Amino acid sequence: MARSKFERKKPHVNIGTIGHVDHGKTTLTAAISATLSTLGSTAAKKFDEIDAAPEEKARGITINTAHVEYETDNRHYAHVDCPGHADYVKNMITGAAQMDGAILVVSAADGPMPQTREHILLAKQVGVPTLVVFLNKEDQVDDEELLELVELEGRELLSQYDFPGDDIPFVAGSALLALEAVTKNTSIKKGEDKWVDKIFSLMEAVDTYIPTPERDVDKTFLMAVEDVFSITGRGTVATGRIERGIIKVGDTIEIVGLRETRTTTITGLEMFQKTLEEGLAGDNIGILLRGVQKKDIERGMVLAKPGTITPHTQFEAEVYILTKEEGGRHTPFFPGYRPQFYVRTTDVTGTINQFTADDGTDAEMVMPGDRIKMTAELINAIAIEQGMRFAIREGGRTVGAGVVSKILK
């Protein structure tokens, strides 16, 4: 019966390494990859392969990210690592590589640094739900008390940003020494090298402490409307990609955003010119709606399970503003700035009223390349929820990206 073990689908989790530059994020990624490759299910990725992260585009922004996959006995992981600090900021805000949890890397020799703080704040704002901490470069710390001090400081910092600082697992080790040991002996086993064992301990903490995320199909139904047309004798069809959940013929849904919310029943589902009984997250589908005129529904509205999403006009968001080189603005902007907010499938005009710096003070203006917290008000109410991503556009070009951190109204 031993065979079946390899056929089971392990739960999939997306994680990443975050933390201050030069504290060893990429080395740790390589060390995890190499260590877990000794278990035989995934090939090791070398440091250079991870460091030469390819460019990708998300919401009109170019980001360098490396994707590494590996498996523990319990799970399959997709791990994202970014070479530069700006790439992290952009990745976390655009959600280009979604993270269900993250490993915060802190150098045991240096302790938490400014970017450590910034990444914890960002993780909180953009909704990375769970963190595990790796205290790297333990081999450079002779004094046990110093290690305890760094851990204490790390826990306080996490609590400050509303993470459960007392409960988060901290694992100390050396990514470099573990990587060297595995590179020398690729069939190394648990118990043969203390540094490699610490990587196994870290992954045990990740396995147990970072929860398996709810799959998209298990969430409540939502689809943003991309197009609307009428079929003579049958009614109005809204097309789009199902963002989450499952939809069946006969289900009652709400049409939310831009106008009064209204309820309707689904009388048919079509995909690739064929009728279906149900649609799942990820499907591009046409939904036939009972008693709805073509003029009643438009691109930018969403179809959703009743009571699960509501229209709003005011929210706080964490945003990244593109530099001139990235194709963004050449000049700063000030409170009162009125761009378009591209949300799901449509642009809505809004006013940016206020900017707040990380230390809580008001900022007078925002420069290209800045990351800032802002308050915005849209001219039309649309379906908005916490953690939702959007682009900021001006005359059709992207000048920034954001994520809703709080709904105000």
From Swiss-Prot:
It is found in: Plastid, Chloroplast. GO terms for molecular function: GTP binding; GTPase activity; translation elongation factor activity. Its EC number is 3.6.5.3. Residues 81-84 are annotated as: G3. Residues 174-176 are annotated as: G5. GTP hydrolase that promotes the GTP-dependent binding of aminoacyl-tRNA to the A-site of ribosomes during protein biosynthesis. PANTHER family: ELONGATION FACTOR TU, MITOCHONDRIAL (PTHR43721:SF22), ELONGATION FACTOR TU-RELATED (PTHR43721). Belongs to the TRAFAC class translation factor GTPase superfamily. Classic translation factor GTPase family. EF-Tu/EF-1A subfamily. This is Elongation factor Tu, chloroplastic. It comes from Porphyra purpurea (Red seaweed). The gene is tufA.
